[in-house]
Amino acid sequence: MLTRIISGLVLLPLLFFVIINGGISIYLGALICSLIGLYEFFRVFEGSGYKPLKTTIYAMTVIMYTAMTYSGMSYSHIVISVTYLIFAVGAVYIMNRRIRVEDLMITIMGYIYIPVFLSHINLLSMDQTIYIWLVFIFAWGSDTCAYFTGMFFGKHKLIPEISPKKTIEGAIGGVVGTVLLTLVFARYFQEPNPIYFIPLAMIGSTVSQIGDLFASAIKREFGIKDYGNLIPGHGGILDRFDSILFTAPLTYYGITFITYIQNL
């Protein structure tokens, strides 16, 4: 626990610096986390004999983030173009029998699950930087509230076959705590309609917990405890960012919808 706390105290100032500084800091931070996350993700499958197109995905991830930041192309065009290139390269490998179809599917899954999902933080940084904080409130705020609620009040297991320690009471506490934290955020940044953020916070906490359980299900399926050991006390990048991968897209599209409603 002490190691976990120390790691958190080291990483939090770094996170604050990246978000507050914005621009190139967020671009590099998201890109580096995506590349490390991909490495951890593919390593799990390689241990069971799969052969994902790692080099191709690493290159395409760099291209995607760079195009997002500097090209002026629309996000959807970039993602579709990169996905097409991955399929094209994979098809050539399959025809030459260098990989199997399932290897390509794992490659595509890794690409969507990690760099595409996480890249929504970059999208937020372009014109809605303050809302990046919600990505982390929905993920880490929810996790913290769920942890302490479960510790003191947890009696009924949530999904014990995937995560034995999580409880229904903890999950509910995570949602309630996230709503309260989000209202504090809305008040601090003087949002004109904070009530709009309540359903977003509830969905955000729920999605965060689903992201955590999804990552846990993969680990349990392949018989591993952590995705890596890069962060002492926490595991790898994916162990720390499993919920972030799910809350980043939700936050972006949720804020886009709220902005649309407010402008009607």
Residue ranges with predicted function:
Residues L12, T178-V179, R240, T247, ...:
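Hydrophobic transmembrane alpha-helices of multi-pass small-molecule transporters
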Residues F222-S243:
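Interfacial loop-to-transmembrane junctions
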Residues L181, F185, L250-I255:
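Hydrophobic alpha-helical transmembrane segments that constitute the membrane-spanning cores
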Residues M1-T167, A171-M202:
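Membrane-embedded alpha-helical bundles of polytopic integral membrane proteins
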Residues Y253-L264:
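Juxtamembrane boundary at the C-terminal end of a transmembrane helix
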